[in-house]
Amino acid sequence: WADVDRAWMKIKTPIQIGHPLEYYEDHFRKAVALEWDIRLTNPKFAQNDHRVNKIKSAFAKIYSSFEPNTKSEEYKKIYDFSFKSLDKVQLYVGRPALFFGAEFNGMFSAQVVPNDEIVSLEEGKKIFAFSDEILQTSRAKPFLKLSREIFGQELLTKDRMFLFNETASWHQVYDISTVGHEYGHILWCDEQTESVMNKTGNFKNIEEFKATT
């Protein structure tokens, strides 16, 4: 399967095949199934360096704030490894075209793959994001009584106004919060981080908090 990942990483066309081993939960059967879908990349979100450069700038600022200590050399290796990893990321922002279980809507948000760190060391990672899909789904949702009781009608109305009337700003928020989260998975990790942390089973739990931060 590592060889499948290596071949898959070399597909860099606007039409992308979903990662063949990325699992999603099936809420109906309480099971998992192989993902195998086709995705179309939005030409408006072509590959560019502005996201990576901003992330590098912020990452460098945080790193430079560290006080020198006995682990400085180790931190520098992780810092350099993270920069090299960022340079190998392929970003695809688009929409699903064909996918298994088409009636099970809600699968698509964003993802970074593959999870094989040996392959990622060689080939990098792909980030998939589905901003148009999320926007359309969000706009289709009705007001819920529970939401109104918790947040109040005024906040829900402002949120709905933003959702429908400020499309460009909505995409910017998605870019920072969701695409930025996926890039965040790449920072502060080297080739051994996952295997070392998984000795106690803590990697995925801590990793999600780290990526969001």
Positions of predicted regions on the chain:
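Contiguous, non-catalytic segments that form substrate-binding/exosite surfaces or channel walls
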Residues: 1-161, 170
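Alpha-helical scaffolds flanking conserved acidic
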Residues: 172-176, 205-207
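Active-site recognition of the HExxH zinc-binding catalytic motif
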Residues: 176-190, 211
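Post-HExxH zinc-binding segment in Zn-dependent metallohydrolases
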Residues: 202-213
